Amino acid sequence: MSFEDLGVSRWLSEALAAMKIHTPTAIQSGCIPKILSGHDCIGGAKTGSGKTIAFAAPMLTQWSEDPFGIFGLVLTPTRELALQIAEQFAALGASMNIKISVVVGGEDFVKQTLELQKKPHFVIATPGRLADHILNSGEETISGLRRIKYLVLDEADRLLSNSFGGDLERCFSVLPPSEKRQTCLFTATVTDAVRALKEKPPAQGKPPVFLHEVETVDQVAIPSTLSIKYVFVPSYVKEAYLNSILRLPQYEKSTAVIFVNRTTTAEVLRRTLRKLEFRVASLHSEMPQSERTNSVQRFKAGAARILIATDVASRGLDIPSVELVVNFDIPADPDDFIHRVGRTARAGRSGDAVTIIAEKDIDRIASIEERINKKMELLEEVTDDSVITDSLTATSVAKRESLMEMDKENFGEKRKINRKKRGLETEKIRVVKSKKEKSKKSLRQ
């Protein structure tokens, strides 16, 4: 079956062919015809299955028939995912002079305001930054959102969690009602909250919500080609054990993603491993967007062998050929563990995941093993004696120097200052907006 057989426009089918995409994947075959026929859609499929094209192809097909204003809005939880989705839309729509605006934190607010005022064809955004524009940038900026035809929630399970609730509500407040737009939710984890949306009665005059699942996290836990191992360590020497793991013969040349739970931990590890002469990059929410983008590009290009990341890198990001995943910290949610280790052993390739377990992590590990229905195996090559002999002293010195540098640079204070700056910028925008409204009122009088 071809994309044209699914109802995709010929120009778009040719664009896909130019990208060496000829045959629809299961999620694409299942969702594209239903979306084109007017159904709201819930699509569940694992990372790397082609979910973006599953919603982009029908949106672009229908947009090309009537390319007015802001046709579609895609909301996604992280800046990197927004940029990645925008790149795919731009590549697919290049021959049609498509205009796309990426609205994410860490980028120039005023520039984004001007872009939105020009009514691009598609807006790809994170909820927080779009909510800021809705609150502060005025009607001229957000008016185009009131007439969109499509709303997509990418990584919907994350977006529907409590952490995005207020921002999502504000975003929805300026969109057309559900009966006047199509809504598509795509995710690798079809949670109960997502699945419950299918049971809601459809809006008046609309067909029922369509649900299509293909190998979601609920259906496929861990690939058979993924080896999952652990080391049990005292919490105060985790970095030394990590150093030893990365120097094992089977891992010393592997591309690796190291997951941590906190941005401060990511920064400490980045500096420590760099002093130990590893080629590393980091990715976390406190970094400026330009640095985040540069880190991903360096890792993809092989300039950095190791990427240290918070969970912003656990979902959706197109990072091919990760050979090793290390959980330096244990996630609270077992599904986050599945997303993390899912960065490796993709498309039938083999991969390794090593989890560093400290004494406080036992309960979380039990929950993870129950969730994946599999016991982790001990990584026998890393022993207490080998760590003490080969890694402990050098790692301790490197970590101490890193902490001293961060203290000297007021790393924690900089984070507080940056947050205050963001708050001041928002307040300035409010003041400017208020003055404009007063000026308009006085002119009318």
UniProtKB/Swiss-Prot annotation:
InterPro entries: DEAD/DEAH_box_helicase_dom, DEAD_box_RNA_helicase, Helicase_ATP-bd, Helicase_C-like, P-loop_NTPase, RNA-helicase_DEAD-box_CS, RNA_helicase_DEAD_Q_motif. It comes from the Eukaryota. Pfam families: DEAD, Helicase_C. The keyword Nucleus applies. Its EC number is 3.6.4.13. SUPFAM superfamilies: P-loop containing nucleoside triphosphate hydrolases. ATP binds at A45, K46, T47, G48, S49, G50, K51, T52. GO terms for molecular function: ATP binding; ATP hydrolysis activity; RNA binding; RNA helicase activity. Keywords: ATP-binding, Helicase, Hydrolase, Nucleotide-binding, Nucleus, Ribosome biogenesis, RNA-binding, rRNA processing. Residues 32-208 form the Helicase ATP-binding domain. A motif (DEAD box) lies at residues 154-157. One of its GO terms (cellular component) is nucleolus. It is found in: Nucleus, Nucleolus. GO terms for biological process: endonucleolytic cleavage in 5'-ETS of tricistronic rRNA transcript (SSU-rRNA, 5.8S rRNA, LSU-rRNA); endonucleolytic cleavage in ITS1 to separate SSU-rRNA from 5.8S rRNA and LSU-rRNA from tricistronic rRNA transcript (SSU-rRNA, 5.8S rRNA, LSU-rRNA); endonucleolytic cleavage to generate mature 5'-end of SSU-rRNA from (SSU-rRNA, 5.8S rRNA, LSU-rRNA). Residues 431-445 have a biased composition (Basic residues). Residues 247-387 form the Helicase C-terminal domain. It catalyses: ATP + H2O = ADP + phosphate + H(+). The Q motif is unique to and characteristic of the DEAD box family of RNA helicases and controls ATP binding and hydrolysis. ATP-binding RNA helicase involved in 40S ribosomal subunit biogenesis and is required for the normal formation of 18S rRNAs through pre-rRNA processing at A0, A1 and A2 sites. Required for vegetative growth. Belongs to the DEAD box helicase family. DDX49/DBP8 subfamily. This is ATP-dependent RNA helicase DBP8. It comes from Scheffersomyces stipitis (strain ATCC 58785 / CBS 6054 / NBRC 10063 / NRRL Y-11545). The gene is DBP8.
